[in-house]
């Protein structure tokens, strides 16, 4: 424990306010009582800190009071933890409590806690009784060095953090570092971020201290706690020094600028952008972590503006990473904790607008000039455009318009040389200083991994210009965590060799992993070579790629090592560099053909010699190298040559723009093959090239005069082929022949960061450039640059730095601005490439976020192709054709493609070649389909396509890239029955039964599928006729076409019915009745009872069948809910894994909503969010205890904070103990809805809670008397809800009218009155017959006017009263429905036309989901109704519409009304040939002629002839309904048409108007029956 002599005092504002020490509880209590007399001391803390420290503080303080014989008392108050407590309500609660305790102006408040407690209690002190004294006792590192110092106090508001508060200095700040002992490691690191920030902007020496001691600090931090020991004992002096350095800086700045006049702004380095990220990512990502991201972004901004050197950004980034702090939103830590959150750029800029540093609308950011120094002594004004560029994922590149330009560009250090130098220096003895090091993602991954392996320590000198590597002589250890390498292929290959040298004990293994692209890049030949030499290496996922685990008892054995080197020279370099540390000298034999990129092998050997190891090439054996045992001896200094591959980009800019560029440090003496690019590629294309041993200058020819290269072998500079390709794209200056450039020798580029050859072909095509692949290269037809097309969807970069930089070059000559997606990928080799374009070349760059890169758009690509998998006989072909028809895609059967390719049927293929060979050919066809048809196709695959690992990987990667793999299935017994009748298919391999095959494949289908469709089954029969309808609903959700949630948001009120049946089949007889007035159906999965389940939990297939059956039985959206026992349901609380699989499956089933309880683990919730696709998540919580208060809503706010990270909808349900609980809930609803966009479902359960259900307007759960039971206590029916809302004035009675004459016999009044009665609405509907249209105006102005229908003769004349018209009203030139829209005091009358809806809805109901796309339709008659009929058929997808009328002239008049794409064909009944009549097959017919009109004989005969040619499922609608069954209906019925009468269309048209007025759907059957009566 500390005594007073061990306590360090730091002055601030002229007072010795800050006291720092270890274990100073006793000192604190004594010092307060001695120096700050009071009658009342109040310790305020939170419920996290209280159990750890409050009792000890109380007892020590009370003992001190007793010892001092002071007349004082100590009070304590504990509040809920978290940011939600930092609010007005909590401030008021504390103040009220203080008053009840008779606290007076001499009271001293002691804030014991983190930043929330300190800010809140400080603000209470600043305002209580106009200001009382307070003391800060911070318990987190973040609060110790930041929030507790300087007197800033405040609370949050709905519009932002800390917007209300005061400057109020504490009497003391007691920094007791003993609190850090119980602080979780992540929270300590959170505070270290602020310490790094302070050093980065104020003191380079402090920054160096942090740089050099990260490993020491983290080792102590991660050391397990031992009872009775202080975790940081071993580093007390270091820890104290670091904390004090930050405290002193802040105290110094605050003393100079207490009230934030300018200088104090500097303490906000990293905060302007960091706070914007925090507004979205908190609480999953902590304040310090967000500030770390903000620091990097603000440093990048300073670099972009030309103020901060690139190495300083790299140095800052390296320091942050060394403390396990995130440096971007793509950082693994952010992905781990908040992968479900997205940070839209415009939202970030919007948050940045609310910043106290800003000057009005001008944003001010702290700009670094160097590590430890800022650009100005206050925050600097920065434009939104520059901020937007830094924050944006993508970039728009403008055309380069300068006619002359002469620039010198120095590329960063070579990635190849940097990575090799890092390995050699780390493995060597002694210290080596590396200069011109590349600061990039790749080298950052390499350095971090080498440190984790214990290979070396790194530090910086010369302001970050020099990297000091202290090698450990090849001594390595198994790291504590896996080594994450992103997409750094060079690091992955080199480190695989290094990791093979690690001697592991007790089964410890080195694990190398990376991002999803790294996990498909090849490393197999290197692994094979190392395995053959005794290393134990396992693939953890895909064979031949990372992740790997490696273990070896004695490291590399040595001797002869054979390696295939035709794919990557990096395999060779990896073994070369680790070979000196093998147990025996190594003889490395390169086998399998000519090694690729020989110059890079030579580079490695030359560099090894510089570090003291000489490799000799055999003179007797080809491609064989001898490497002696030894250790690298580090040279004192090693300068890294600039990257020759990167140098090609500025030189290429000169070439295509006709300007001049010099690269001063790459010349003919370079070790790098790409240094030849200017001489071997650009000079033959027409450029003037000057190259010395150390520099290269290119002067481009006049714009547009570059020459193509007939053929060039780029095997010695393969990476530069991308640059050559974009230059060749505009090389069209030829005297004869085609302007084609052929590049060869680059086959290895297919297995780089991406398949670069295929990528170049694909992306150049977007510019309109004709290209194609060669066996080992590419050909490009040059194009006049003025004719380049704009890539409409942007250039996709494949996470490949060289793709991005190459296309940025071509963008400069494109006449229109070019979007390049994922600009950050250049950080791999040239992190500041965009800065060079902006500063050196003067190119205008604009930040952008494309649809293609916007994660909010869902994981499924627009128009993504769909691959169907599933058992033989599951219906893949049938369903595939249905999908293709509904989406207007093309359909392919992959089995048929295979048969065409091999020119024999499948059965013969298997008979001749065998099953294994057949599977390989099947795999090839699948791969070809995925490559050639990524969009716009539906493919049915063979049932066993998932049998091969390679095919399963193809399917899985297809899903990752945004494709859809749909598993199609039907009841297995039906499949067996179907296949027993089909003798054309080959028997299964080894005569397996269908049951055995499905049992084996079932897991694979689940592994590969992104979605799942199971055919609906009712009474053990597949309902084939319902598949089209069910599929249509399914596709709406999985392709993102559904707008259900958006529709709910725009409705005044919405409800959903809860189904709690054991089987959906039991609900079907009453389904229409019970869902009257509902907007959605909730399936309570916990109520379902699977008869085959042994544990009471329904199987995935059983639930899938239930969902499928429900989907084909209703038009309503489906909510999938599993309610646990603890939340008021039936599902076991301890079956989380089963619940997770069911909810994931619900997303694959295409359910509209999935209810996710907030009680599930964060891991489960994260997984659900990541896989939700277009399914919407309802995040829910039910307080069954009734103890949570809406008036003191801290628990509820914590749930809101958690839910808002994931939710599309938040559902919070309490338990009402009295009516007042509902009123408190409404106050909570009002507060929360003002501050968030996510819709809320809020209500209380129980008898007393029914009022809250009535007041809840969004998605209120309802019940129905016909259901077996209520799903929750207090549920009401739709009718009860509406009736109650009428009584409380929530729904006001309105009057509706029918305008026209004559209308006395209209059925509309009975239609609408019935609907109102059934739904409990108080409205009336009456016929308003009038002689003139002007008389209706007085009705339109009635205060209770709810709407009107309009019939003849006023459909046109009433339009003069309308303020706006719907598209349909404009199209028809008539209004039949008037909708009043009240916006405040203003009344807007909207005219609509629903005549067509009666026809459309009648057909939609009769078709039951069957599509009319690409079918023929017929309209009989050419009066006014015929227009609505034609319009409806076109909307239904009918591609050709025949029009038949007795008067031909009227038919042509109707045809002239419609655009040509309606494809209307007039039938002349007098002249139509009989063969034409017989060739027309109809699917839909509408008769619009009165039933009592006798048709001419020829017209009648033509109608009968046409009706005789009916397609399957044809629907006939006669708009006449007097009589109900007309003569034409009789003819159609005899010909087996599905007939509908005009009264049905009339009712459906009326209900369409009803829906427009009320937002509710009325029950058709009950209304129709009443109208008939």
Curated annotation (Swiss-Prot):
Gene Ontology molecular function terms on file: 3-dehydroquinate dehydratase activity; 3-dehydroquinate synthase activity; 3-phosphoshikimate 1-carboxyvinyltransferase activity; ATP binding; metal ion binding; shikimate 3-dehydrogenase (NADP+) activity; shikimate kinase activity
Residues the entry annotates as binding Zn(2+): 194, 271, 287
SUPFAM superfamilies cross-referenced by the UniProt entry: Aldolase (SSF51569), Aminoacid dehydrogenase-like, N-terminal domain (SSF53223), Dehydroquinate synthase-like (SSF56796), EPT/RTPC-like (SSF55205), NAD(P)-binding Rossmann-fold domains (SSF51735), P-loop containing nucleoside triphosphate hydrolases (SSF52540)
UniProt cross-references to Pfam families, sorted A to Z: DHQ_synthase (PF01761), DHQS_C (PF24621), DHquinase_I (PF01487), EPSP_synthase (PF00275), SDH_C (PF18317), Shikimate_dh_N (PF08501), SKI (PF01202)
Region listing for Shikimate kinase, in residue ranges: 863-1058
Residues engaged in binding NAD(+): 46-48, 83-86, 114-116, 119, 139-140, 161, 179-182, 190
Keyword Signal annotated: no
Main subcellular location: cytoplasm
Annotated metabolic or biological route of this protein: Metabolic intermediate biosynthesis; chorismate biosynthesis; chorismate from D-erythrose 4-phosphate and phosphoenolpyruvate: step 2/7; Metabolic intermediate biosynthesis; chorismate biosynthesis; chorismate from D-erythrose 4-phosphate and phosphoenolpyruvate: step 3/7; Metabolic intermediate biosynthesis; chorismate biosynthesis; chorismate from D-erythrose 4-phosphate and phosphoenolpyruvate: step 4/7; Metabolic intermediate biosynthesis; chorismate biosynthesis; chorismate from D-erythrose 4-phosphate and phosphoenolpyruvate: step 5/7
Cofactor binding notes: Binds 2 Zn(2+) ions per subunit.
GO biological process: amino acid biosynthetic process; aromatic amino acid family biosynthetic process; chorismate biosynthetic process
Location(s), subcellular: Cytoplasm
The keyword Kinase is annotated on this UniProt entry: yes
Protein name: Pentafunctional AROM polypeptide
Natural source organism: Schizosaccharomyces pombe (strain 972 / ATCC 24843)
Lineage, uppermost ranks: Eukaryota, Fungi, Dikarya, Ascomycota, Taphrinomycotina
